């Protein structure tokens, strides 16, 4: 009896049969992998879920994927809505954020339309310095970019004022008003008297010379020149000098005639002959007889004696001051034409405590010299 053995080929086929069936089942269960030629596209984002991109990334994405690398504001809106359906809702909120980022972010540049006309809206493009602000095209990771230097406007440059350098307005320097770092004029700082205590005395600065005093000094020079041309003995010269002494009392406790620089030809009451005084003159010496002559006696010798007092009043003795009332005061006599100077008398000024101008009368009987105040 002969035993039959299976051939080797049949045995190999029997052993491989279960493995091939198992591989077919695994191939049917596994999904097909996407190929290079005709693979499946990734699924669209969920409309209910907000995309994980910032507004700057959305704007940059829309501009980069455009054909001309620039878009209008409405074009940016349309791209975002078509790319991410989540933004179809609540358009007012996110569109305001898009406009806000376009205006304030320096990586977006506004480009006006060509030709202008009735078409509104400008183009927006990316700054060439900010092309690589996203790392390798990943819009979720943004690099920190250094802002490009842009000079400030001309009227806000530090160190320059609105009207010129140094805080001067219109070429005239304003004392106490300086320009700060951005060109604004700081108001002058004054010390208000309402916040001061009376028990704390503060030194007061000297008051500047008023504008009227400057005008009066110029008028005095012109009037003196006119008086010298008319002659020292003319009544108009005395009136001019008397008029100059009147308004000066309202600017200070002392008369301005004393401090004015009188030209030669006009005699001051304290220094005998004319000339600009370098310093305030000393008070007049007490009248007493002088055995020796002075320069101011030359033109005072021809003055008439004083008028007799009215109402029976006794005449004062020689060498003594006698106050004269406005009714009894004798008018000053004009000096002779040969005298070197011109006499004048101060007008009545009630607010002054004392008079700084006087004229000299010569007594022909006794020869004594005394002065009178014309109040």
UniProtKB/Swiss-Prot annotation:
CDD domains from the UniProt entry: FH_FOXL2
Disulfide bonds: none
Keywords from the named record: Differentiation, DNA-binding, Isopeptide bond, Nucleus, Phosphoprotein, Transcription, Transcription regulation, Ubl conjugation
DNA-binding region per Swiss-Prot/TrEMBL record: 50-144
Gene Ontology cellular-component terms listed: Flemming body; nucleoplasm; nucleus
Record field: compositional bias (Basic residues): 289-299
GO biological process, one term: single fertilization
Record-level Gene Ontology MF annotations: cysteine-type endopeptidase regulator activity involved in apoptotic process; DNA binding; DNA-binding transcription activator activity, RNA polymerase II-specific; DNA-binding transcription factor activity; nuclear estrogen receptor binding; RNA polymerase II cis-regulatory region sequence-specific DNA binding; ubiquitin conjugating enzyme binding
Region (Disordered): 1-50, 272-341
InterPro entries tied to this protein: FH_FOXL2, Fork_head_dom, FOX_domain-containing, TF_fork_head_CS_1, TF_fork_head_CS_2, WH-like_DNA-bd_sf, WH_DNA-bd_sf
Protein known as: Forkhead box protein L2
Protein's organism: Mus musculus
Lineage: Eukaryota, Metazoa, Chordata, Craniata, Vertebrata
Gene (UniProt): Foxl2
């Amino acid at each position: 009896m002969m035993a039959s053995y299976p051939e080797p080929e049949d045995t190999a086929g029997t052993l491989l049969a279960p493995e091939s069936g198992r591989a077919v089942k695994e191939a049917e269960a596994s999904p097909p992998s996407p190929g290079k030629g005709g693979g499946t596209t990734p699924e669209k984002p969920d409309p209910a879920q907000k995309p994980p991109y910032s507004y700057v990334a959305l704007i940059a994405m829309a501009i980069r994927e455009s054909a001309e690398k620039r878009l209008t504001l409405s074009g940016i809106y349309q791209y975002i809505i078509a790319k991410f359906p989540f933004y179809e809702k609540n358009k007012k909120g996110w569109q305001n954020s898009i406009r806000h980022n376009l205006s304030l972010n320096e990586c977006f540049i506004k480009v006006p339309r060509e030709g202008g006309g009735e078409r509104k809206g400008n183009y927006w493009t990316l700054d060439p310095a900010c092309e690589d602000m996203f790392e390798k095209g990943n819009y979720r990771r943004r690099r920190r970019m250094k802002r490009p230097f842009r000079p400030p406007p001309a009227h806000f440059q530090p160190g320059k004022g609105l009207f010129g350098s140094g805080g001067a307005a219109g070429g005239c320097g304003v004392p106490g008003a300086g320009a700060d770092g951005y060109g604004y004029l700081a108001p002058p700082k004054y010390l208000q008297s309402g916040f001061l205590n009376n028990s704390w005395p503060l030194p007061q600065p000297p008051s500047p010379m008023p504008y009227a005093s400057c005008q009066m000094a110029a008028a005095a020079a012109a009037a003196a020149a006119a008086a010298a041309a008319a002659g020292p003995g003319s009544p108009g010269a005395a009136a001019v000098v008397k008029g100059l002494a009147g308004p000066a009392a309202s600017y200070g406790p002392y008369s301005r005639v004393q401090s004015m620089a009188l030209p030669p030809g006009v005699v001051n009451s304290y220094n005998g002959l004319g000339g600009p005084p370098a310093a305030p003159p000393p008070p007049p010496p007490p009248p007493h007889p002088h055995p020796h002559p002075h320069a101011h006696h030359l033109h005072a010798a021809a003055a008439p004696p004083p008028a007799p007092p009215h109402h029976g009043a006794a005449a004062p003795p020689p060498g003594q001051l006698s106050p004269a009332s406005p009714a009894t005061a004798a008018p000053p006599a004009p000096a002779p034409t040969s005298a070197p100077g011109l006499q004048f008398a101060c007008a009545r000024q009630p607010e002054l405590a004392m008079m700084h101008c006087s004229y000299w009368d010569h007594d022909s009987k006794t020869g004594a010299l005394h002065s009178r105040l014309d109040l």
